[in-house]
Amino acid sequence: MKKAPVTQTPVKDFFFRGLICGGFGPVVMGIIYFILHFTVEEFSLSGMAVFTAVISTYLLAFVHAGASVFYQIESWSLGKSVLFHFSLLYVAYVLCYVLNDWLPFDLLSLGIFTAVFAGGYALILLVISVSIRMTVRRLNKQLR
């Protein structure tokens, strides 16, 4: 199956996607903080904590949206695309979570996070792969 062509250079496409979707990170963070305000007794944040969360979640959403460009670089194998996509997302999530003190910076916490992240990533990749295979089979049957 041929990959969709990149509309621009991969770098431009990465930044374009990031700019389009980056704002969703702070919106999600705001919704979570709003819910915490009503569910956690005496929930409060410093101005610096809010600033750090807004900037880091924007950058996380930016990177997350842009990283999908790795799957559209036609000269790359699927394995290389997965490796770069996974690695970039992993580093972005770890940095965001550690900077916001949402994840302690110790070996045990990072190990657990890594296992959960890798397992979740593998599960999502499996679901997408099965979905694509089922769609291809259905389309091939329709062509016969």
PLM features per residue range, with description:
Residues 1-4, 137-144:
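Short, charged juxtamembrane terminal tails flanking transmembrane helices
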Residues 1-40:
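N-terminal signal-anchor transmembrane alpha-helix
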Residues 30, 34, 66, 70, ...:
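Alpha-helical transmembrane segments of multipass membrane proteins
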Residues 34-42, 98-104:
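Juxtamembrane "helix-exit" motif on the non-cytosolic side of transmembrane helices
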Residues 36-79:
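Membrane-helix boundary/interface segments in integral membrane proteins
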Residues 44-50, 80-81, 106-116:
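Non-cytosolic membrane-interface motifs at loop->transmembrane helix junctions
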Residues 85-110:
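C-terminal halves and exits of single transmembrane alpha-helices
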Residues 118-138:
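Membrane-water interface at the C-terminal end of transmembrane alpha helices
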